[in-house]
Swiss-Prot record:
Organism: Mus musculus (Mouse)
Pathway this chain belongs to: Carbohydrate degradation; pentose phosphate pathway; D-ribulose 5-phosphate from D-glucose 6-phosphate (oxidative stage): step 1/3
Subunit and partners: Homotetramer; dimer of dimers. Interacts with SIRT2; the interaction is enhanced by H(2)O(2) treatment. Forms a ternary complex with ALDOB and TP53; this interaction is direct. ALDOB stabilizes the complex inhibiting G6PD activity and keeping oxidative pentose phosphate metabolism in check.
Gene encoding the protein: G6pdx
Residues annotated as binding D-glucose 6-phosphate: K171, H201, Y202, L203, G204, K205, E239, D258, K360, R365, Q395
Protein's recorded name: Glucose-6-phosphate 1-dehydrogenase X
Any single Pfam family the record assigns to this protein: G6PD_C
Family listed: Belongs to the glucose-6-phosphate dehydrogenase family.
Residue(s) carrying N-acetylalanine: A2
Reaction equation(s) it catalyzes: D-glucose 6-phosphate + NADP(+) = 6-phospho-D-glucono-1,5-lactone + NADPH + H(+)
GO BP: any one term: pentose-phosphate shunt, oxidative branch
Positions that bind NADP(+) 1: G38, A39, S40, G41, D42, L43, A44, K45, R72, Y147, K171
Family matches, as InterPro entries: G6P_DH (IPR001282), G6P_DH_AS (IPR019796), G6P_DH_C (IPR022675), G6P_DH_NAD-bd (IPR022674), NAD(P)-bd_dom_sf (IPR036291)
Modification(s) after translation: Acetylated by ELP3 at Lys-403; acetylation inhibits its homodimerization and enzyme activity. Deacetylated by SIRT2 at Lys-403; deacetylation stimulates its enzyme activity.
Subcellular location: Cytoplasm, Cytosol; Membrane
Amino acid sequence: MAEQVALSRTQVCGILREELYQGDAFHQADTHIFIIMGASGDLAKKKIYPTIWWLFRDGLLPEDTFIVGYARSRLTVDDIRKQSEPFFKATPEERPKLEEFFARNSYVAGQYDDAASYKHLNSHMNALHQGMQANRLFYLALPPTVYEAVTKNIQETCMSQTGWNRIIVEKPFGRDLQSSNQLSNHISSLFREDQIYRIDHYLGKEMVQNLMVLRFANRIFGPIWNRDNIACVILTFKEPFGTEGRGGYFDEFGIIRDVMQNHLLQMLCLVAMEKPATTGSDDVRDEKVKVLKCISEVETDNVVLGQYVGNPNGEGEAANGYLDDPTVPHGSTTATFAAAVLYVENERWDGVPFILRCGKALNERKAEVRLQFRDVAGDIFHQQCKRNELVIRVQPNEAVYTKMMTKKPGMFFNPEESELDLTYGNRYKNVKLPDAYERLILDVFCGSQMHFVRSDELREAWRIFTPLLHKIDREKPQPIPYVYGSRGPTEADELMKRVGFQYEGTYKWVNPHKL
């Protein structure tokens, strides 16, 4: 058998664009200007600039593309380069291309609420136009407190008159239903829905995007994907590190607003939704909204909140608790861990608990979807059989595997837990997967909104969590302490057991592949 030739990142992304957009979704001859609002910030230097570089390096951006940074700080392109280049992972062979990339960069300093600053920015962009059509893409890498002023000034002063205009908005999209609606109404008064791209980077993850294919391209899953066969669904997001000196920002939002209300709820929608009419953006998002409308507000009896404390045996950061972070307010009751149970009240899912778990300073880095199936009826193996599970692991080491029972090799007729395993690092070992931000920013250039959050999705998501969040903000319940590096509060395990999840602790996964 001939050895499989490794695909380059360019080939992978090129195939992706060809398949999704037939290669002609944007005109290569047009001028495209990518404006990073908040270019001096952490998100810009660690994610946005590196992502634009990767797309530029691999030839995936339109040929006539310019990158303009905008922020209040008095900086130069050289300053931006020094801040962001360490995250580019550029090789010595890529130096000439890197110089070409920064030659297409410029920077404009200005205030976020000053009309004169935006007129200066607009004049700068007009000078870059070379083709008949000029398209502008604004990325708001900014705190939500300045969204209203920035979007108003962009709409009044900086819109292209000869091409399309698109705006990318980063989470958090408000703090609750009221503030989210206020922000959405403001932005919707300035831009059409097809111009607004609310980014949740988890929707750009390989395995999150794979959920639709797994469900709707495999007949074997269709008949069992319902309440008759599935006992519960667990959606997990775990980080092995704490706030690491950035707790002041995190403390304003907490783990529910930061992870559960967006990342985990989006994954829930993809698990629970009905088959869309097409893979078109609005058809997919219509089905997600239908799921959200079937979910009642979270009940406090179905929620566990935790906050990590230092590990007495830990070293370095692990020895510190959340309250030891000097940026965290003294005595803060903000949760760094949350577990919540939701129910999708429709014919397919009635009575099936969807358990959402997320937290910081836990025992591992992991994001996954786990479907646990019901017990086999008519047990003939004397309670030796464990429940089947289908696991979609988003990170690390993307994988799909099924826990199942097989006969243990040998003379005796004993069942044993095993797995059917698709680990991406083994099956696709020569394929380099694009980063989530690469996929999503390429989607914006191509005008595809399938992996972005629509305003009615956002409204329903906040409706589900706002009463709980208001109660937490008002009553400030004391979160349950858990040790840095642990699995989280044992009360969360008890909640999961109460609603029907069975954790046996007997399964030992043996990785047959060396990743």
